[in-house]
Swiss-Prot record:
The lineage of its organism: Eukaryota, Metazoa, Chordata, Craniata, Vertebrata. GO terms for molecular function: guanyl-nucleotide exchange factor activity. Residues 798-888 form the dDENN domain. PROSITE patterns: DENN (PS50211). This is DENN domain-containing protein 2C.
Amino acid sequence: MDVGFSRTTVQTLSRSHCKNIKQKISQWEGRANGISNPEKWCPKDFGVRYNCHQEIRLKKNPIAERKSKNLDVTSRENVGLDINENTKSHDQSENENKKHEYDDTHFFKNESESNWVCSRVKEIESCKEDVLDPETSLPPGNFYTSQILWKKIEALPPDKLLNLALEHCDSSEKELNFRVLDSSYGITKSLENIYSEPEGQECGPSINPLPKPRRTFRYLSESGVTPYKERNCDKKYCENNSCAQSSLASSQEPEPKKYGGKIRGRSKRKSFEFEDIQHFRNRNSQTIREELGRNSGSALYYTQSEDNIYEDIIYPTKENPYEDIPVQPLPMWRSPSAWKLPPAKSAFKAPKLPPKPQFLHRKTMEVKNSQAYLRSKLTKDTTLPVTLTEWKLFRAGEVANTKRKNLPRLVLKIDDIFESKRGKKKVKLHSYTGKELPPTKGETSGNESDAEYLPKNRHKRLAQLQPSSKRNPHYQTLERDLIELQEQQLFELFVVVSLQKKPSGISYIPQVIQQFPGKDDHGYKQSKDMEERLKVIPKFCFPDSKDWMPTSELKSETFSFVLTGEDGSRWFGYCKKLLPVGKGKRLPEVYCMVSRLGCFNLFSKILDEVEKRREMSPALVYPFMRSVMEAPFPAPGRTITVKSYLPGAGDESIELCRPLDSRLEHVDFKCLFKCLSVCHLIRVCASLLLERRVIFVANSLSTLSKCGHAVVATLYPFTWQHTYIPVLPASMIDIVCSPTPFLIGILSCSLPQLQDLPIEEVLIVDLCADKFLQEVSDEDEILPPKLQAALMQILEERNEILTQEQNFSQDVTLNSLVSEAFVRFFVELVGHYSLNMTVTERGERVFQREPFRKSHTSRSVRHFLDLFMETQMFAGFIQDRELRKSGVKGLFEIRAIQYLETIPESEPSGMNRILRSLGSKMKFLQKK
């Protein structure tokens, strides 16, 4: 677009931008001698493109029409944009473009054309108030903008448009220099030409280079000096609009950097066209500005760095950068290291973004604390606690202060008793080097107390008594059993067993008189295994069938038995013995439910409902049992409802609740402590830990079954893997002669037959008299003395502890007390097993036996582990942990983690420390 400039203005502008003395002299000589070359009168291109059709449009458009459109052009010009050629003008001939193209290195052409230039300038000055057609004079579109954008903002008033532009200029990195010119000069000119020659070069001939892309927005010149006239205009404008500018400026956005007192030039600036256009469009919308508030602006962030555009990033700071990151809680069996925990809030400083938290990337804990371990090819187990060093780091943080805060009072009481009896001796970590460590000569040396010295003959005796039974590859744990039961039914079989006379008429034999599901039921197919079980179930329902005679009075009795399959699976039989409805002397009947779920109380309630219906009619049992079998399998702590019809009462709903703690579902410790003293109970448990043979004798089926289940429950987290028959029928008494380990209960009437059998190395316990009928005589020396003393103290003071704890919590029961006491006992023995789990290169977990055993500082514990680690219970326990792909979440693992948190760093102590220091000094002297 052609804009008129007076001769004085052109000379002033050209004089202010002369690069050297030679140009100034040439300019002065031109003024003094007169201009002969008209091309030299052409004004220099100061960043403003001229329309080649200006002359034609000035003749066609009337003055009135141009005045009416002056407002729109002014609004576009005041934005501070470089107005380029219209895209329509590029379609004209090449001659017209060359005719109006100006040289970038000269201000004037040949002197022969001076008259034409003067007339041309006068013509422009006469039409200085004229305005072009707004549609034609719009800035052309480029890579970043288009004419459509300018058409959308064309209708805005000039004041509002300029204020919006100034608002953006105040919030950008470098303030744009808007100039308010007189109405006669309604357009701004850039004081720099990108086609001008570099400094220090001679003005050469005119060159017409290819057009380069120009920025839409105009920035300050490199010198940073504003002409005097324009500074006055800016000052006047700022005085009139100071309030508006102060309200629009944002205090949060950074101020432009200055380098050596000068604002960085255009050549050193990064491109902001896209950001500025986006920001400018957002400023036009009042709704967007209200929603975004003070932080409204471009969605892109501005860089302040001159060297690297990714160096400093302005980002709105937060009090906690991790507050928007949902972090899932870690599993209970492993805790994160301190280096994985997010740092304090004070560590985050704006404007730099903090790095991505490491705990979002890593899913395992691997802290290696020795060079030997680093050289090994095996890695630590990732599903359980790894090293003591990691636990020290973890306790050093905030968790250390609340280590004992959330533990129940009962657990704290038990821990205090064990710590007082045991002393300061705890396990120490042995770094695994990839080889089995051989027994060292000084392993048994140390500062052990005299009470812990073990006679050699005793250790030899225990080793000889240890049975060498074949391990069962099908190891069953309570957790695995419960997983397998999720898809099972509540029970497998229900039978009613009665006594029938033998053909000889002298004695009675048990027979099944009612069965559900029946053999003829549709859809029921009896397996071969079930047929074998049906043959022996009547014998377990009446283990003393030959001693029964018809009677008119009989006290109801409940008991249970266990059937062990060849694969190690167990079936629980829940029985209730009673007299059938009738008059006179009658033979008793037994209701028996066979299930894979160990929950005595739940099935006792079902058997009570069966008894109620069978008294009315045996036909009512089938509908009820079918509704129970179709009921869903209850989860721990859940209740299921069974609906059935009862004549005279109508429809009934029976709620069956399964206890939350599945370990103690079929356990009654009251009966166990009623029959056995604490001293005898500890000796029985010690014999079972070494997998010896144990026989219980009692005159009641319920006593035998309850005591047998309770003793087995004390072995948690280990599971008895061998023969387990709480009630053994008299006809099967020969089983006690088996050389394999077993736990068997027999009635007192079968005791004479038992004494006649050749039995060796067996512990026979009379539950009614609380005494040992036969023993090996070393049962009280099996367990470590200090741990055994702590366990005995807790069990002997159980009533006092329960009385104290029940004042604070009603959930404390005898079962929970006994369970926590034995769990703590085993945590002291094997609670550090996870520290000796390694993972091979193939991803297989491997247990390191020798480092595990030697990690105990107590010699008595190490001697016990020598024997206990050879049992099938321990082997199955480790095998189950090795094969599991996910961590175990039982009570034992929870208490083991809490125990590992209290382990101090392993340091040499006592005589060992002195001997090691002397050894190092001797080696040092030998080197000299």
